[in-house]
């Protein structure tokens, strides 16, 4: 991925992945599984090389999927550095029925400014908060996570905590009010056919 980013070809890889995701969603929905969704990443480079809105909405229309089942992950940094046009495009996605997720929330220096300036649907709390090993840092990190979770409730947003690896973390996060988790505690990344065999 780093090579694709350095050469400016990441947008081609992203578009390829978007189409694969939409194709899979179309298959699932044809089989009656409207409850499943896939999150895809949008990088800053994508905005430079193509009309992201037209590309994604065209795929959704071509394969006739429910827009809300294709969730769009945009990093906090990408939103912070985005142009007015790019931020407007993100809002167009929301108006068209897509859900926008801020990925790696809390990794930047202006996290709360991001929330002030941008309407989104989901915050994904950066896994760095759970990777702290020093006891005094763990307590501080969990306090920050608790604050973010409380904030999402006030703003009416959903929240996902990334990097969950232990039952203890699950228990603490559940007490704080987080109900959606992502991490190796559940599974490492697996091929889609293996996912279907295990969970469908």
Label each PLM-derived region with a short phrase.
Residues 89:
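Conserved functional hotspot residues or short segments at active or partner-binding sites
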Residues 26-30, 95, 175:
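Regular, well-ordered alpha-helical segments
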């Amino acid at each position: 991925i780093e090579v694709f980013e350095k050469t400016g070809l990441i947008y081609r890889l992203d578009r390829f992945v978007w189409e694969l995701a939409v194709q899979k969603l179309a298959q699932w929905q044809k089989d009656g599984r409207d409850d499943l969704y896939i999150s895809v990443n949008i990088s800053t480079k994508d905005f430079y090389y193509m009309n992201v809105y037209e590309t994604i909405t065209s795929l959704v229309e071509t394969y006739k999927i429910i827009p809300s089942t294709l969730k769009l992950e945009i990093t906090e940094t990408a939103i912070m550095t985005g142009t007015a046009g790019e931020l407007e495009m993100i809002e167009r996605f929301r108006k068209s029925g897509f859900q926008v997720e801020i990925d790696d929330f809390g990794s930047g220096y202006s996290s709360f400014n991001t929330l002030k300036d941008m309407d989104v649907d989901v915050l994904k709390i950066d896994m760095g908060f759970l990777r702290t090993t020093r006891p005094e840092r763990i307590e501080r990190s969990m306090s920050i996570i608790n604050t973010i979770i409380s904030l999402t409730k006030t703003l009416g947003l959903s929240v996902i905590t990334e990097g969950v690896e232990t039952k203890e973390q699950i228990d603490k996060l559940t007490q704080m009010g987080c109900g959606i988790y992502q991490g190796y505690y559940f599974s490492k990344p697996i091929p889609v056919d293996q996912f279907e065999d295990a969970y469908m």
